[in-house]
C-alpha cells in the first residue's frame, strides 16, 4: 500500500480588527519577481515544516521568520505555527543586518493578539516552539 502524500500546513494571513491583512497588502506592493520568490519560500515552509536555516530562523517564543533573498534586498516574513496552520503576521524588507526592534515588537504584538483571539484560555501551548530539524 502506498504511503499517503504529506499534507501541507495551511497558510493564513493575520487580520486586523478593521479586516486588513497587512502581510497580503505588503506582498501586493512588491514586484512580481519578489512576490514569486517570497511565495516559493513560504510554500517550501508549508510543505516541509519544520525547516531550519537558511530559510527559516527562530526568533524565540514561538515566533519564526522566513528569510527570502531578493537580489539586492532581503525580505522577512514573521509567522507562527499553531496546530496545522502557519499564520503570517508581518513582512518587511530589511535595510540593515539587524531587524529593527519596532518590527519585531509589531510581530510579537500580532502573535499575542492572534493567540488571544483563537485560544479561549489564552494559552499558547499549541504554538510551535520546537527548533526545526537541521
Language model segments and positions:
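Basic, Lys/Arg-enriched alpha-helical interface segments
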Residues: 1-74, 83-86, 93-134
